[in-house]
Amino acid sequence: MKATQTLIATTKELPKEAVLISHQYMLKAGLIKKLASGIYTWMPLGLKVLQKIQNIVRDEMNKAGASELLLPSILPSELLQETHRWDKFGPELLKLHDRHNRDFCYGPTHEEPIVDMARDTIKSYKQLPLNLYQIQTKFRDEIRPRFGVMRAREFIMKDAYSFHENSQCLRNTYNTMYATYCNILDKIGLAYRPVKADTGAIGGDNSHEFQVLANAGEDIICYSNGSDYAANIELATYAKPDLSKRVNSQNTIEKIHTPNIKTIEKLCKEMSFDIKKTIKTMVIKDAGGNFFALVIRGDHELNETKINKLDQIIAPYTLATKEEIFSIFNANPGSLGIYNCPISIIADYSAIAITDLVCGANEDDYHFTNVNWDRDVTNYQIADIRNVVTGDISPDGKGTLELTNGIEVGHIFELEDVYSKPMNANIIGQDGKSKPMLMGCYGFGVSRVMAAAIEQSHDENGIIWPESIAPYQVAILPINYNKSDKVKEVADKLCQDLLGDGIDVLLDDRGARPGVMFADADLIGYSHHVVIGDRLLEQGLIEYKNRKTQEKQEITIAELIKLLK
């Protein structure tokens, strides 16, 4: 391919909202062009990267025994009303109606149409298992689309759906898809971690996310440094302390004056307390109107997902207002505690492990010290309600937990009958009885993984692609291509030879100044740069540069071809 035959649209101008490196470099390199908020045109170079990712995904899905299909982008409201998601999805669902005033939406995900197709075509267990996938454009009307294609309104996704007679069959395909996603990310060449995850709005039971490791990642994932345990922070847990080893304190409770101290940080600073000896008491109100006092150690944070999953809580909960708190405690937030607490207490294991703790006195401007569980506070329940922190012992007892940032690029679920049951997608089982098919759901963000790759690997000059998805493996950069017959002859022949060897190559024949060519090559991220000029040709040499290592060599063309092979 010659550069003059495609559109290389590099630019130095950037919109203010481009804060992530991936967003900046995709715009500067001319991979995408903004059309509207959260909606982008895929330019030729960007589309090449996208297609390479799609090809890897498609190849691995086919190897795993999945079959490709294509569902409509526009979905009738009746389907989503069967699962009640027409209203539950909220404003992210882009709704429209046709000339006959029938309601439709732009598909944000495709569980309903795939189940509709399956219930009409799959009638017996003999047709199962079946795994179907598509690579398609989705649309979710994000309230604040940001970070370029990382959180766009329109995006490209591979979504697969599997159908089964029983749970063991579903688990087998789930495990196959888990391995397939690992193969995809290995083949692309990204550092990643599969982590246990919350099922969220999709529903179902078992669930894993596939997180590309990157500092700009919105998700926090935790993993053990001594085992294969890994989980999203929403679900991550820790080895519970042995509460039987708590020391029985002989110290008596003391009430201390703490004027104008409303935060743990200020309390510890002004009163010289160890923050690990303090607790925070936060009041919530569940969906049934019940109030609870949630208690965690002073240096810990509540975990919303864990709290909403508690049997005692009618989800979703909200934080109690200042007025509600005062009406219950006759004290303001910042002075609340567990001693003589008027509402039910749910305390985290780490808070329960503290002896002689410090807490609010349920009276403004006062705190208690030397408060002890069981001796002073007996009416409480224990639960895991906090985020894990670095240094927590892994729940399997092997190693300690570490935290890092990740970008979610894949998510797999065991849906069971969450969609098939309400949509009456039934089969005749081996026992001759009718029952709902069980389902798995497997999503992979094709356009998102492109941004994740940039976040994981770049430098001050531009993108450093994994070679498997670089827009071109090799860029031939001829100096004075349009003026030197020798340079043109060598560059043209090398281009044809590399193409003949199956190497994806771009010949930059634009006639741009060397500095512009070199800067564009670094910015766009071609994996291998080949500079051809009269001076080196006189010695039978060309200059080779590896984009990833920045290593430069003056070598012969024969040596170059051997190196690239």
Curated annotation (Swiss-Prot):
Any one GO CC term of the record: cytosol
Q: Which UniProt keywords apply?
A: Aminoacyl-tRNA synthetase, ATP-binding, Cytoplasm, Ligase, Nucleotide-binding, Protein biosynthesis
| Coiled-coil positions | none
Q: Which PROSITE patterns match?
A: AA_TRNA_LIGASE_II
Name the CDD domains for this protein: ProRS-INS (cd04334), ProRS_anticodon_short (cd00861), ProRS_core_prok (cd00779)
Catalytic activity line of the entry? tRNA(Pro) + L-proline + ATP = L-prolyl-tRNA(Pro) + AMP + diphosphate
Principal localization reads: cytoplasm
- Compartments where found: Cytoplasm
Pfam families given in the database record: HGTP_anticodon, tRNA-synt_2b, tRNA_edit
**Which pairs are disulfide-linked?**
none
Q: Which GO terms describe its biological process?
A: prolyl-tRNA aminoacylation
Q: Which InterPro entries does the protein's record reference?
A: aa-tRNA-synt_IIb, aa-tRNA-synth_II, aa-tRNA-synth_II/BPL/LPL, Anticodon-bd, Anticodon-bd_dom_sf, Pro-tRNA-ligase_IIa, Pro-tRNA-synth_IIa_bac-type, Pro-tRNA-Synthase_IIa_type1
- Any one GO molecular function term: ATP binding
Q: What is its EC number?
A: 6.1.1.15
What is the protein's known function?
Catalyzes the attachment of proline to tRNA(Pro) in a two-step reaction: proline is first activated by ATP to form Pro-AMP and then transferred to the acceptor end of tRNA(Pro). As ProRS can inadvertently accommodate and process non-cognate amino acids such as alanine and cysteine, to avoid such errors it has two additional distinct editing activities against alanine. One activity is designated as 'pretransfer' editing and involves the tRNA(Pro)-independent hydrolysis of activated Ala-AMP.
UniProt domain comment: Consists of three domains: the N-terminal catalytic domain, the editing domain and the C-terminal anticodon-binding domain.
Q: What's the subunit arrangement here?
A: Homodimer.
Q: Which PANTHER family match?
A: MITOCHONDRIAL RIBOSOME PROTEIN L39/PROLYL-TRNA LIGASE FAMILY MEMBER (PTHR42753), PROLINE--TRNA LIGASE (PTHR42753:SF2)
* Family per similarity comment: Belongs to the class-II aminoacyl-tRNA synthetase family. ProS type 1 subfamily.
Protein name, entry field = Proline--tRNA ligase
This protein's encoding gene: proS
